[in-house]
Regions:
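Active-site neighborhoods and metal-handling regions in enzymes and metal-associated proteins
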Residues: 1-176
Length: 176
């Protein structure tokens, strides 16, 4: 972790070489202590954090709605900037610049380190993904969500997408 990496290997070796063996055995890493200190939150902070997470999910829900997305018209950048403006209107800040991208059957929307998506316009049948977080009082959210843009005459996502989501969630549950 970047917060607990202050002692370089050279310095560590120098300290260890200058200490008698009986003291060398007492040297332990403080990394977990530093991480636990940063992770420690008061009950008020946890209440605020839960509210912050709820706000984050509500912003994503609205961003992925027909209020913001018009298939064939709205771009991924339109959604990104709508999210940023929404956060600003609430007096909050984004923790990092949001990412919105699309995935299409038979096509990939993988992008390079420049973050530039190959697809701009969100169409019916697209799977829209976002990575989005807000910050408040040193508390940060980091949420990723998916949404399916219904095709004409569809009332719900196709069965294959529901099954894929279920499998993904099952793996996620197994790993947490």
């Amino acid at each position: 972790y970047g917060i607990a990496d202050g002692l370089a290997k050279t310095d560590f070796d120098g300290i260890m070489n200058s200490l008698p063996n009986k003291f060398q055995k007492r040297i332990v890493s403080a990394e977990s202590l530093a991480v636990r200190w940063i992770e420690t939150r008061t009950s008020i902070e946890m209440t605020i954090y839960n509210t912050l997470v709820e706000i984050t999910h509500n912003i994503i829900k609205e961003a992925f709605s027909s209020k913001v997305i018009t298939p064939g018209v709205t771009t991924t950048d339109d959604v990104v900037w709508w999210m940023r403006e929404k956060v600003s209107s609430l007096g909050l800040k984004t923790w990092f610049h949001p990412t919105v991208d699309v995935q299409r059957t038979g096509q990939s929307d993988l992008y390079g380190f420049d973050g530039e998506s190959k697809f701009d316009i969100i169409n019916s049948g697209d799977l829209v993904h976002c990575d989005f977080g807000i910050t408040y009082l040193t508390l940060n959210t980091d949420c990723q969500e998916l949404a399916y843009v219904l095709r004409t005459n569809e009332t719900e996502a196709p069965e294959y997408l529901k099954k894929a989501l279920k499998k993904g969630n099952d793996v996620q549950d197994d790993l947490t």
